[in-house]
């Protein structure tokens, strides 16, 4: 049995691939396979996936950027079917030119997806930026050859994000 963790604990240990995060929490994959634990999580997640709300400044920021000529894409380690359902649920379909997710539920990472996405975009690398909330997002942006802005109100703590020596923001308005 694992101990309960706080949001701060979560943000201090969450990692990609997600299997590494499970290990940090104390999972013993010799006793229970990662795929089994991962599917258990997905069952719970599926029942609660629409409980979170968008941050108050999300829609205004997306709309302002879109009106100024910026395009938006989603790059996620989430399963593509679930990701598209979430985008639709939050009525964001018209905001994004590309929605890129994984074919499975195991969140191994998104470097390969990012490289594929950047090839689909009709922009120079210095015209593209990633906004993310994990150290992995920074690594993906580096692999893609683009600028990364990190938000400290997501999966990783401010301290972890600052360790990447990049810009870290607490809201879209400060971005």
Task: Indicate residue ranges for each PLM-predicted region.
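Short, acidic loop-to-helix structural element flanking the phosphoryl-transfer center
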Residues: 46-74, 80-87, 111
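Surface-exposed amphipathic alpha-helices with a cationic face
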Residues: 59-66, 118, 138-142
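Structural recognition of alpha->loop->beta junctions
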Residues: 90-102, 160-175
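Conserved Lys-Pro-Asp/Glu-containing loop-to-beta segment of HAD-superfamily phosphomonoesterases
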Residues: 110-139
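Acidic, Mg2+-coordinating phosphoryl-transfer loop and its flanking beta/alpha structural elements
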Residues: 129-170
């Amino acid at each position: 049995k694992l101990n309960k963790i706080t949001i701060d604990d979560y943000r201090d240990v969450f990692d990609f691939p997600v299997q590494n995060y499970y290990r940090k929490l104390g999972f013993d994959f010799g006793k229970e396979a990662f795929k089994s634990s991962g599917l258990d999580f997905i069952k719970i997640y599926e029942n609660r996936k629409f409980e979170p709300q968008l941050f108050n400044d999300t829609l205004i920021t997306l709309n302002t950027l879109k009106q100024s000529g910026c395009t938006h894409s989603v790059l996620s380690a989430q399963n593509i079917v679930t990701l598209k359902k979430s985008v639709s649920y939050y009525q964001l379909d018209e905001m994004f030119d590309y929605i890129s997710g994984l074919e499975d539920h195991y969140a191994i990472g998104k470097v390969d997806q990012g490289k594929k996405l950047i090839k689909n975009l009709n922009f120079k690398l210095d015209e593209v930026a990633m906004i993310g909330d994990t150290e992995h997002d920074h690594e993906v942006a580096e692999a893609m050859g683009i600028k990364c802005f990190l938000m400290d109100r997501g999966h990783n703590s401010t301290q972890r994000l600052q360790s990447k020596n990049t810009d870290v923001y607490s809201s879209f308005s400060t971005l």
